[in-house]
Amino acid sequence: METDLLFQLLQPYFALLTSDVKPQRRTSHLIKDILDLPTVNGEIDEFGRCKSSLDQAKESPIEKCQKTKRKKARTTFSGKQVFELEKQFEAKKYLSSSDRSELAKRLDVTETQVKIWFQNRRTKWKKIESEKERSGEIPDDQIVKPQ
């Protein structure tokens, strides 16, 4: 009885499996044909590769270098600049835009350089503080200083 019920439930699926539908076969094994990718201005070679990328591969290393953006050199702060930045950091962990502008002018660097320096310094400071907490030391900001 259970077999009859199971057969009735699965009968529509058996019909799909046994139908005479023949799968379509592709004769081309090119990626563009398999994926039905639209061609860009018909610039596809006989192997299904984009011709413009082939042209780029023929560029000399010098030509490639000239096209790539150059990474800005890392800023090296002088001892005096680092001293002033550290002094400001001890006073304030976060600078206002006016403080940042004033400090940048005083140190002869850009505001962005000051901003990034403070971001990096805060990251270093937070890492040091969390290591102190894990080791059982009292973080600097929780030490009560006599006046």
UniProtKB/Swiss-Prot annotation:
Domain of life assignment: Eukaryota
Keyword flag Transmembrane: no
Record's compositionally biased regions (Basic and acidic residues): 128-137
Keyword terms, alphabetized: Developmental protein, DNA-binding, Homeobox, Nucleus
PROSITE patterns, A to Z: HOMEOBOX_1, HOMEOBOX_2
Record keyword Iron present: no
Protein name: Homeobox protein ceh-9
Lineage of source species: Eukaryota, Metazoa, Ecdysozoa, Nematoda, Chromadorea
